[in-house]
Amino acid sequence: MAGQEQQQPQSRESEFEDDAPATPPAPGEAQASAATQGVDDLLDEIDGVLESNAEEFVRAFVQKGGQ
């Protein structure tokens, strides 16, 4: 069917999402969120170092002397 566009019906769920009250995260979700934030912070720090001097960053992790 070349030249014909198919239109998909929009979900009615999106109309009701704003009306639903926000539920607080479960304790496990809060802990996972905190762990994720820590990882994100570490990755941001690594990105910053790589942007400034990638060669020095790599040298710091190269094993020297067969260790």
Swiss-Prot record:
GO MF term set: proteasome binding; protein tag activity
UniProt region (ARC ATPase binding), positions on chain: 25-61
Annotated metabolic or biological route of this protein: Protein degradation; proteasomal Pup-dependent pathway
Keywords, alphabetical: Isopeptide bond, Ubl conjugation pathway
Post-translational modification summary for this protein: Is modified by deamidation of its C-terminal glutamine to glutamate by the deamidase Dop, a prerequisite to the subsequent pupylation process.
This protein's domain notes: The N-terminal unstructured half of Pup provides a signal required to initiate unfolding and degradation by the proteasome but is not needed for pupylation, while the C-terminal helical half of Pup interacts with ARC to target proteins to the proteasome.
NCBIfam families (UniProt xref): pupylate_cterm
Family the UniProt entry places it in: Belongs to the prokaryotic ubiquitin-like protein family.
Free-text function comment from the UniProt entry: Protein modifier that is covalently attached to lysine residues of substrate proteins, thereby targeting them for proteasomal degradation. The tagging system is termed pupylation.
Protein name in the entry: Prokaryotic ubiquitin-like protein Pup
